[in-house]
């Protein structure tokens, strides 16, 4: 995850992007599809939003996309991103959030995992707006869109046991009872990034949980591949979506391997730990300023994403997570882009329908 840097966020204005922007807006408002030529020569189709009936969504098979509410209109720059959105937006605008929720719902996504950097941060304020827009969507269409937060453990405000306890208490008291906060079997769900990074230990997290959630009234999903996390957390997820399996051509084996490890843990400990299989459209963080160890997972015009989805579903997951809806700095977004239009939302819709049954 790469949060925007402070600065002017300079970007080159391109005429073709302006034309695409107008076409997208017309497509959303008008009754027919609008066609435009993509920057890389692809033929892009932008269709009106159509929310599927609630009866078509299986609440026992959630699809949750990692989501970033930190952009301003000055953020967008081809110098720091491998692609650009069809609409350069401000994450704080209600119209932006409403549009993103509609796009996601149309694709069969059931909620966002909102990157969260602490009480009072814009990601906190915008999460409240996300819940409000989700309520508005359900009132208008009957579609239940329920989101949660991604506890960014490396964020300055979230470092150290005392800060973690304080912030989690705020989260649970402020949001957990909202009807559009993601619940699983009646319990609020939280996702945690990199729980064992920066000298954090399982013992520390166990102490945190005793203070914040002594009765295990919530569900905690940890990012990571180490099943020892399950001694404190209720499940694991892979923000990376197991990209090494994509590059190695054995993605299905990777996902099934994690399913088998969790099943073995559950059998040995008489638990019901959760496997959240991740899917990835591609990845490219080579333009992130100052980042070392960058890499690329090629998109292959949607083939990578389809392979990732097929592998995830073959592992009989409890949940499916998408990396990501809109992490533009790392090039892992499915949100409509200049290069691909709404290709990745369309692919999401196809596989989400299969998953929902």
Enumerate the language-model features and the residues they cover.
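N-terminal secretory signal peptides that target proteins for export/translocation
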Residues: 1-12
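Hydrophobic alpha-helical segments, especially transmembrane helices
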Residues: 14-15, 62
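Sec-dependent signal peptide cleavage junction
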Residues: 29-40
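Glycan-processing catalytic domains of CAZymes
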Residues: 39-357
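Residue-level micro-sites within transmembrane alpha helices that shape
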Residues: 12-13, 326
């Amino acid at each position: 995850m790469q949060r925007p840097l402070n600065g002017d966020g300079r970007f080159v204005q391109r005429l073709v992007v302006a034309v695409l922007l107008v076409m997208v807006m017309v497509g959303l408002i008008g009754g027919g599809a609008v066609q435009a030529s993509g920057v890389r020569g692809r033929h892009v189709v932008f269709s009106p939003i159509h929310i599927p009936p609630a009866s078509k969504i299986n609440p026992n098979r959630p699809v949750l996309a990692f989501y970033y509410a930190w952009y301003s209109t000055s953020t967008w720059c081809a110098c720091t991103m491998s692609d650009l959105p069809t609409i350069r937006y401000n994450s704080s605008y209600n119209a932006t959030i409403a549009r993103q929720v509609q796009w996601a719902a149309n694709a069969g996504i059931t909620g966002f995992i909102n990157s969260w950097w602490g009480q009072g941060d814009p990601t906190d304020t915008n999460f409240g707006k996300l819940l409000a827009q989700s309520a508005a969507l359900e009132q208008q269409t009957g579609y239940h869109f329920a989101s949660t937060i991604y506890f960014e453990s490396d964020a300055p405000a979230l470092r150290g046991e005392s800060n973690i306890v304080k912030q989690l208490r705020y989260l649970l008291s402020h949001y957990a009872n909202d009807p559009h906060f993601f619940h699983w079997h009646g319990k609020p769900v939280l996702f945690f990034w990199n729980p064992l990074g920066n000298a954090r230990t399982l013992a520390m997290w166990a102490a945190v949980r005793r203070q914040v959630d002594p009765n295990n009234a919530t569900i905690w999903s940890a990012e990571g591949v180490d099943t020892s996390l399950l001694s404190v957390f209720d499940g694991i997820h892979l923000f990376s979506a197991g990209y090494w399996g994509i590059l190695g051509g054995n993605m299905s084996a990777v996902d099934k391997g994690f399913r088998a490890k969790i099943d073995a843990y559950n059998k040995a400990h008489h638990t019901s730990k959760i496997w959240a299989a991740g899917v990835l459209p591609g990845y490219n963080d080579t333009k992130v300023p100052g980042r070392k160890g960058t890499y690329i997972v090629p998109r292959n015009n949607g083939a990578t994403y389809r392979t990732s989805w097929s592998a995830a579903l073959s592992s009989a997951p409890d949940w499916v997570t998408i990396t990501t809806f809109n992490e533009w700095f790392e090039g892992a977004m499915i949100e409509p882009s200049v290069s691909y239009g709404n290709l990745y939302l369309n692919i999401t819709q196809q596989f989400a329908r299969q998953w929902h049954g």
